Each structure stands twice: as structure tokens, then as C-alpha cells.
């Protein structure tokens, strides 16, 4: 390790600029620059020119000398002394160098962790091999919700409960224009919420390249611009996310199938679309494409949402079939071929032909290229990094958060995990509690859940009682002329405490957070029933569902308390 003494720096931003300049010098592997101490600690290759180091610093207007070199002039100018006095007044007397935190990734978990670590006083290096922002803003949540919204509007123009007095019209879909509008909003949000924030934070240095562990204290970064750099750290967070999984179906890899990434970026709407998958991404996009004009066939190995309460899958299946989406339950593709611009799927129910094939059967952690074994970081059989509730891995100084772990794959979970990981990396003690985690699927009707289903509660030895309220009992749904779906409450028998809610409703995502707060605050179903809810809102359905435990809500007048 080579140390430089640097005079003239006046702030942490100065140190960041010096670090950047030194790391551009040939032979410099990494640099840790401390403004309070006035030093730069360098990992350099043998033969690196000391003159090149001091010249790089001098080019920024500062003076640098090797720490073990004899002083050439003991006289310090008044300006330098004043800079030293000002710096000493602004900083703690301990003059300890900032904790060096490396974050691999730039999505929800990574950004939350980087910003929290800086808030806690750390210096952060963020490493991203691709586009800043991760899955959510670029190829996930944001573009998919825009496409779903477009499809919803197209559907209402074509068909609504008010067609008798407002005749429907067949919409013209200009997919290229819609895609341009979608991508413009993606780029706007990426800059506002990711790139702009990183650019404006002097305590965060961004490296564009692919990282792999050298050991449990350093990384090797293959820079996108060429060459490699060794980056040392005190703490490291792995937040590399996940990618679409590809099932081992013969012929699939040789075909031009879509994942969600390609589907969201397509500038055309296929006439026929086959979808392999039976959960969130598959079903959101299946319905969106159907509403934009595709003839959609969904292949489900089991039933739709087979891991959830059976009533959820039944309700969504009924809604899909009512819109003309073909749902093939208990159906698997055993062979995929692509001939003459057409997909041919061999299934347990015969042959299926389509113009495009969307495969959305889950996601796999982005951990294979990280050389985690070099740092002693354990993964499970699926390649997900094993962590505890504090996001700690099996290696003491390395943490992980988000979709590269076995945490639920929601961006808000990833962000919460990243924040708590940063607290723990900087000396705190925070845990991630997912006992009241909401989940929303943006089909129409939407699916929203929190807490236990009945089956999950019974698996954990909890005796339950439950009620299911269909939406024809909810005034808001009646006023909307859309009574598809239900609200189901699960309570602990004996105590009456609410422990789970499952909802299928056009606006289920807007009501579930009330259920989250009720569960978090250990409310009984009677306490929920006694609350004031505004009339003609969908969330009032929670109150009505709670009332069904003690009375027949069909016999109540409007908004009866």
C-alpha cells in the first residue's frame, strides 16, 4: 500500500475528484482518499511512477507527496493553514477515514443502500455492468404498468358496462407511438430517480463494469471501457437482481421466444400470442396483449396462481375467459419449434400454433458471474444468496438484498432490504420484517394479498375462521357496474385477530394497505368492522367483509355502521 500526503483539499468532493484522477493513472488498482486526513492510500502495481501520481493530483490544483518522502519545504502558506483550520472545524476530531462501502448493482436495493450508507457517513462505490436503474424502471414495473394502462383504456373503448348509452368503438393501436411514449417516461424516471441522484452525490462513485470477488475484501471490475480495476472495501452489498428464467423445454432455446424484456420492447402486437406461465408477469402481459388485439393462449402447468388461495385463480381464470383469453390448465409444452415464422408448441392437449411465444415462468438470481465462492458467500440450490434477517451473508463483511436473494421479488421489498443492509453495514442493527408484506398483481381485476392464507395458517398450526365477501355486496362495485371478484378475511380463531386478506377486485391494490396496517397493529376483525370507512370506496369492502363475521351484510342499509 502506497500513501500520498495531499494538501489543498477543502471538502469530501475534493477527495472524490482526487480519487477519480488517481484511479486513471496506469498501474493504480484502487485509491482510498480521505479529505480529513489529507491522504490517499493506493493499491498499485510494481513499477508505477510516483511522479505520475503526484502529477495527477497537481493537475487538480492540489499538492501531493509520498508519505515516506523527506519534506522539501516545511513552510506552509497562510491559505493552506486556513484550509486546514476550516477542515478541522467541520470534521470530528477523530479524523477517521470514511467506511468504504461497495454496492454491486443499481436497482431498488442498490440505490436505497447507497444513499443510506452515505447518510450514515460512508464513502460508496457503486458498480453497474448495464443500464443504471435495474429491472424495475427499465424493463419491469414501470414499462409494464404503462402498457397495462394503455391496454385498459383500449379495452374500455371497445367494451364497458355503459355501452348501451355510450356506444363502443374499436380503437386504433399505433404500437410504435405507444412504445415511444412508454420509453420516454422510462428514460425520464431513470434520470430523475437514479442517474441524476447518483451524479449529484459526491460521496458516491459509479463504475461501469462487471464485478467479481477476488476475496472477501476486494473485487475485480472488468470495466466496460476496457481493462480491469481492483476495488477494495470495508463492506460490500450484492444487489444484482434477477433475470427471466428459461425452462428446459426441448427446442425453446433455439427459437426466438420472448421474455418479458422483449415483450415490453416490441413495436408490434402479434396476431397470435402463446404464453407459458401462470403467475404475475405471464398473466399481466397476457391480458395486456389480448386487450391490445392479440389472440392469447395461456399455458398453465397447474392452475392460475396455484400457490395462492384457490379462489384467486378461479376468479382470474373466469375474468380471462370472459375476455376471450384461452386458459389451458394442467398443460405443459413438451417441445417448441419455430418454422416459417411460426411457433409450434407440442402440448399435453395437442399442438398449438402462434406468431410469438412469451415465456414467463419465474426469475433466476444474477449471481453466477460474481465468483461468490472466492469471498465465502453461500448460495442455495437456485443460486440465490443465503442471508439472515439483517441481510448478512455467510461472509462477515458482505451483505445481499433484493432479487439476488430468496426474498420476495418486489422492488419495495428490495429497497427496504437495501436500506436495512446499509444500516447494518455502518454499525447499526436493523431487520426486515415481512410478516405483513402486501403483494399486488396488476391484472384486471387486480389481485392483492397480505398475511396468511387459510392453508398457510393451517400449515403453521394456526386455527382459523374466514369469510369471503363477493363484490356484489360492495356499493362501489355496484356503482361501477363491475362486481367481478371478492374480498376474503382470515382471522385467528379464538382471538379474532386479523391475520390475512386476499382480494380480487378492479382496485384491489388500492385497498390492501389498509389491511396491512390492520394486521400490523394486531386488530381484531371486530375492531376493523367498527372503523369509519368512506362510503362508495372499494376499501369499504374491508369493513363489510369484517361485518360478515357477526351479521348478514345483505340486510344492512347503505353505509350502516
From Swiss-Prot:
Disulfide bonds join 136-141. Residues 1-65 form the HMA domain. One of its GO terms (biological process) is detoxification of mercury ion. InterPro entries: FAD/NAD-bd_sf, FAD/NAD-binding_dom, FAD/NAD-linked_Rdtase_dimer_sf, Heavy-metal-associated_CS, HMA_dom, HMA_dom_sf, Mercury_reductase_MerA, Pyr_nuc-diS_OxRdtase. Hg(2+) binds at residues 558-559. Gene3D superfamilies: 3.30.390.30, 3.30.70.100, FAD/NAD(P)-binding domain. NCBIfam families: MerA, PRK13748.1. This is Mercuric reductase. It comes from Enterobacter agglomerans (Erwinia herbicola). The lineage of its organism: Bacteria, Pseudomonadati, Pseudomonadota, Gammaproteobacteria, Enterobacterales. The gene is merA.
Amino acid at each position: 500500500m502506497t500513501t500520498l500526503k495531499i494538501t489543498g483539499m477543502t471538502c469530501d468532493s475534493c477527495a472524490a475528484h482526487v480519487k477519480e484522477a488517481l484511479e486513471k493513472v496506469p498501474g493504480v488498482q484502487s485509491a482510498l482518499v480521505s479529505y480529513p486526513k489529507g491522504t490517499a492510500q493506493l493499491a498499485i502495481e510494481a513499477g508505477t511512477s510516483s511522479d505520475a501520481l503526484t502529477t495527477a493530483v497537481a493537475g487538480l490544483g492540489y499538492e501531493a507527496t509520498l508519505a515516506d518522502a523527506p519534506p522539501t519545504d516545511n513552510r506552509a502558506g497562510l491559505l493552506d493553514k486556513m484550509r486546514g483550520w476550516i477542515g478541522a472545524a467541520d470534521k470530528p476530531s477523530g479524523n477517521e477515514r470514511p467506511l468504504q462501502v461497495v454496492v454491486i448493482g443499481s436497482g431498488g436495493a442498490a440505490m436505497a443502500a447507497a444513499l443510506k450508507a452515505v447518510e450514515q457517513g460512508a464513502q460508496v462505490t457503486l458498480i453497474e455492468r448495464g443500464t443504471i436503474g435495474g429491472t424495475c424502471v427499465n424493463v419491469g414495473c414501470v414499462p409494464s404498468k404503462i402498457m397495462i394502462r394503455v391496454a385498459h383504456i383500449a379495452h374500455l373503448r371497445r367494451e364497458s358496462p355503459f355501452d348501451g348509452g355510450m356506444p363502443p368503438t374499436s380503437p386504433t393501436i399505433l404500437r410504435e407511438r405507444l412504445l415511444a411514449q412508454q420509453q420516454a417516461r422510462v428514460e425520464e424516471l431513470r434520470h430523475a430517480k437514479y442517474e441524476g441522484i447518483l451524479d449529484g452525490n459526491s460521496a458516491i462513485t459509479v463504475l461501469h463494469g462487471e464485478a467479481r470477488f477476488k476475496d472477501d475484501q476486494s473485487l475485480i471490475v472488468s470495466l466496460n471501457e476496457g481493462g480491469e480495476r481492483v476495488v477494495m472495501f470495508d463492506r460490500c452489498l450484492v444487489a444484482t437482481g434477477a433475470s427471466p428464467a428459461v425452462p428446459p423445454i426441448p427446442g425453446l432455446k433455439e427459437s426466438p421466444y420472448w421474455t418479458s424484456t422483449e415483450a415490453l420492447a416490441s413495436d408490434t402486437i402479434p396476431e397470435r400470442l402463446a404464453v407459458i406461465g401462470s403467475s404475475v408477469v405471464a398473466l399481466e402481459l397476457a391480458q395486456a396483449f389480448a386487450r391490445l388485439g392479440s389472440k392469447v393462449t395461456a399455458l398453465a402447468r397447474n392452475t392460475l396462481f396455484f400457490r395462492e388461495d384457490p379462489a384467486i385463480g378461479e376468479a382470474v381464470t373466469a375474468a380471462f375467459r370472459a375476455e376471450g383469453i384461452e386458459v389451458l390448465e394442467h398443460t405443459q409444452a413438451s417441445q417448441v419449434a419455430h418454422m416459417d415464422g411460426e411457433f409450434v408448441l407440442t402440448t399435453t392437449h395437442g399442438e398449438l400454433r402462434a406468431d410469438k411465444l412469451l415465456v414467463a415462468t419465474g426469475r433466476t438470481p444474477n449471481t453466477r458471474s460474481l465468483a461468490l465462492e472466492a469471498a465465502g458467500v453461500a448460495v442455495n440450490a437456485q443460486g440465490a444468496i443465503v442471508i439472515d434477517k439483517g441481510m448478512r451473508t455467510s461472509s462477515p463483511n458482505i451483505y445481499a438484498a433484493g432479487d439476488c436473494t430468496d426474498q420476495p421479488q418486489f422492488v419495495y421489498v428490495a429497497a427496504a432490504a437495501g436500506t436495512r443492509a446499509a444500516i447494518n453495514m455502518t454499525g447499526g442493527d436493523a431487520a426486515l420484517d415481512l410478516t405483513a408484506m402486501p403483494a399486488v398483481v396488476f391484472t384486471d381485476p387486480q389481485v392483492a394479498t397480505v398475511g396468511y392464507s387459510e392453508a398457510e395458517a393451517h400449515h403453521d398450526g394456526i386455527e382459523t375462521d374466514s369469510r369471503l365477501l363477493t363484490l356484489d355486496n360492495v356499493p362501489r362495485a355496484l356503482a361501477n357496474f363491475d362486481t367481478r371478484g371478492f374480498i376474503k378475511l382470515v382471522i385467528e380463531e379464538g382471538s379474532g385477530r386479523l391475520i390475512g386478506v386476499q382480494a380480487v377486485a378492479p382496485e384491489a391494490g388500492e385497498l390492501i394497505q389498509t389491511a396491512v396496517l390492520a394486521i400490523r397493529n394486531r386488530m381484531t376483525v371486530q375492531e376493523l368492522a367498527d372503523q369509519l370507512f368512506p362510503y362508495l370506496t372499494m376499501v369499504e369492502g374491508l369493513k363489510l367483509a369484517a361485518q360478515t363475521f357477526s351479521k348478514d351484510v345483505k340486510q344492512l342499509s347503505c353505509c350502516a355502521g
